[in-house]
Amino acid sequence: MQAAQGVKDASGLYEVERRAYHAARPGFRIAELQISPTQKVPWHYHNNVQDTFYVLKGNLRLFLRDPKEEVRLGPGDTYSVKPRRPHLVTNGGDDSATFLVLQGIGEYDFVPLV
């Protein structure tokens, strides 16, 4: 997969119940997101950074490509997605899900898949 031009701030591309940044510095950041049962982080990938998900409350479902995979996470579970691996994040339960996503090391971008 060739590097595609991504956006530096994806907050306007999809809706969440709550978004907060706990750490942000060049090459690394930690965001906390809360999504309702009907919300999702759409299909995308990152050219340079790895996403590491840590579930605080509720359940997440991650769908991945290259290779195709589905991962279910509950409170205390973690999962890392390597750079350039397309993924979609959905709520895997009936209540809101809250999770941390650690992103780095490298320049952040968000490349949406059409």
Label every model-predicted segment.
Residues 34-36, 46-62, 102-104:
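Short, conserved beta-strand element in jelly-roll/cupin
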